[in-house]
């Protein structure tokens, strides 16, 4: 009888302990509609992909137990040092997908992963793929949508809820949502009086890559200017390849050119030092502006995460200063403090935006514009004859 009582007590204790453990877990519904069991407190996060890494950083570097990719120079400059020493687990989706179940199982044993988080644009079969790797690893996988400007604020609220940082999520959502609302209101005032622009992502001799309109990566450019590059064909952040003859035909009001690295200005210098580019009025009149790159990520996107909102503050103030009327330096510093927990110095700001505010002068090595004009007209003439 006594033995039976002991067994019964042990059984009841086990039931109580299991119930307590279950009570510590919670069901979270991700953006794909998947119900995922998460710990009551999520502290150890592994990002899947660069976009997730960017977005999650705003909630604090202490959450990371892995990173999606090795840090570049700009990331090392602006982000917390400890990230550079974390293991790399890669990305589950995209052309550079390297994440695999075996590695996640291994990392989970070493560092204890509460959840793997992917952020971005939802695509076909994502739910099935995440269910599959979750089953193989016994590690929760969650997807959060952040694919358009309108989805940014909600993504921060959702992440704040999942991470148990509701207050921080609300703060970020309010700040990011405020930028988007200001942008939409100001562009209504601009109406059809947009400047025309192209965004040069790469230059290789006569080959020039532009971000085409209606691209996932070109949402801000399409909205804040008349992006006169043809409709995007390639889905990558490098866009599609064109020739200088194509650029002459477009003849944009502004040329936005990607920086080639943190505090590097190779592409800008190539444009300003070229006799061919000198044929364009935008070059002659100082309307070539460089988009900061690796600061810690490219302001124009690639990946197109919420950090690209700083380009709204920047381009709006350059293109339409009477409407986007504010101190740009103060706005950029505020953004870096809010988004990266980084206090940007005046010197860093000046170097990052050295060629990013318009009215730039040609470099001393630039050829006489007339040579470029003749070369450009000749190229256009040949193009028209074809």
Feature locations, PLM:
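Short, solvent-exposed loop/turn elements at domain surfaces
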Residues: 36-38, 53-58, 73-77, 205-211, ...
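Extracytoplasmic substrate-binding proteins
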Residues: 25-27, 35, 128-207, 230-232, ...
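A contiguous binding-surface segment within folded domains or other stable secondary-structure elements
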Residues: 239-290
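Secretory targeting signatures
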Residues: 1-24, 360-386
